[in-house]
Amino acid sequence: TSRRQRQMCIRDSQLVLLYLFGNSIIASDMFLNMFTTNSGEAFELLDKLAPAVVGVFLLYLPALALAVYSIRRTETLTPLFQKRVFMLAMLMIGSGILVYTPAHRKYPHTAKLDNLYPINAFNNARFAVDSWEAAKNYPRTSRKFDYRATSTRDTELPEIYIFVIGETSRARNWGLYEYERNTTPKLNAMPDVIHFDDVLTQINATHKSVPLMLCPADALNYNEIYRQKSLISAFKQAGFHTSFLSNQLRNGSFTEFFADEADCTIYFAAPKNKPHLHDDVLLSAVDSLLNIGKTKQLIILHTYGSHFNYCERYNTDCRIFTPDHIKEIDHKNKQAMINAYDNSIVATDKFLAQVINKLDRTGKTSAMLYLSDHGEDLLDDERNRFLHASPIPTYYQLHIPFVIWFSDNYSTLFPDDIRQARNRHTTPFDSRVVFHTLL
C-alpha cells in the first residue's frame, strides 16, 4: 500500500477512533495499530461498534455521492458563493489567531499548534507512517548488534525456560490478585507459583509493549530498538535452542522481527473466514519441542489471551460465567462483556497450568514466566473507557499480571533466586523486568 493510500485510510478511520476514545487526542499509536491489526481483529471490533460504523456511512457516503453528482453535472460555484466562503474562512482563522496569541505568550511551552485538532491528528498520522517506514529498515540497522552472550552454568545441565506473553489481560480480573471471582483456580492451587502484585506495562499497545519485553530498549529510549536484537539472540549465543510459537498473525512489527531470530518460528493461523484459534493450539507444539532432545531450550509462546471479542477466546469448559455474548458495546451489555472477559482469564489459567505441568513432568531444571502485554478498559467507571491503546491510559490498561513458576530442580540448584522472587513479590516493577529476569 502506498504512503498516500495509508494516509487516506488513516483519515477516514478517525471517526471510529473518536467514538472509542472521545476524550483523548488521536495519537500515533492508534494509527500504528491500524497497520498491525489484521482484518479478523478489525471485524470482531467493528461488528460491535454499530454507532461508529453507521456514522461513517452517514457522514461520508452522502458527501461522496454529492461530489460525484456535482462533477457529472459540471457544476461550478458562483463567484459570490466563493467570496462568502473565503471571507468566512478568513474570519475563522483570524478568530483562532486572536485566541491563540495570548495563550502562546502566557504558556509558550504548552500552547503549541501541534496540540490543536486536527493539526495534531495529521502530525501523529505522519509520525506513524514515518515510524512504519523506518521499521522496514530494521534488518539493516540492527545487523551489527551483538550481545556476546555466554552461559555461566554447566553446559551439560538441562534447562528449559518458557516465557508466555499474555494478551489484553489485566491483573484486576485475576483471582490470584484477589478478584471477587476465582478466575484462576488452577494457579491458586499451585504453591510454587509466585505472582507479583504491582507490575505495570510500559506501553498499552501490543505492537510496542511486546518488543520492549524482549529487548534492552525501553519506553523512554524507544528509538534504540531500531539497532537492537532480542533476548532470543542472546540465548542462542549462550547455547540454547530457541523457539517462538505465536497464536497471532504476522503483522510486520518488531515482534515479528524478533520472532524470526529463533531457531524455530511457527505462527498458528485460523483457516480463512474462521474464528481465531484458541491458545491451547500451542500446547501440542510445546510437547514436540520438549521431546526434541535439546539440552537447553528457550520457548516463547505468544498467546491471544483476552483479546476482544472475548467470548471467542475459550472453549465451552471455560464458560463459567454467563451470559457471555453481546451484540453491541454499551452499558446494558456490560455484565455479559465482563462475564466473557472473566471466562477468557479462566482459559488463560487453564493454559498456564498445562504449561507448568508439562515442564514439571520433564523433571528438568525449568521455569515459566507469564506477563501480559497490557490490560483493558471494560466500561469500568464514569469515563466509559473501552479497549486499550488510548493516548491517556487508565490503570486498568497498565496494571498487568506477572507470574513465575520454578521447578523443584531449579529451586534446589538456585534457592537464592526463589528467595529473591518471594521477598520482592510486592515490589513495584514494570514490564522491563522480563528481559533482565530471563537473562
Predicted regions and their residues:
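Non-catalytic, well-ordered alpha-helical segments in soluble enzyme domains
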Residues: 236, 410, 415-439
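Metal-dependent active-site segment of extracytoplasmic phospho-/sulfohydrolases and closely related
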Residues: 162-163, 344-387, 435-438
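Internal/C-terminal transmembrane anchor helices
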Residues: 79-105
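Membrane-interfacial interhelical loops
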Residues: 10-58, 105-122
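Single conserved hydrophobic/aromatic residue that forms the stacking wall/gate
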Residues: 1-9
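Active-site-proximal alpha/beta segments of enzymes that process anionic O-linked groups
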Residues: 97-163, 168-328, 430-431, 436-439
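Histidine-centered active-site microenvironments of extracellular/periplasmic hydrolases
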Residues: 178-182, 364-365, 371-415
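A long, amphipathic alpha-helix that forms part
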Residues: 284-287, 325-368, 404, 425, ...
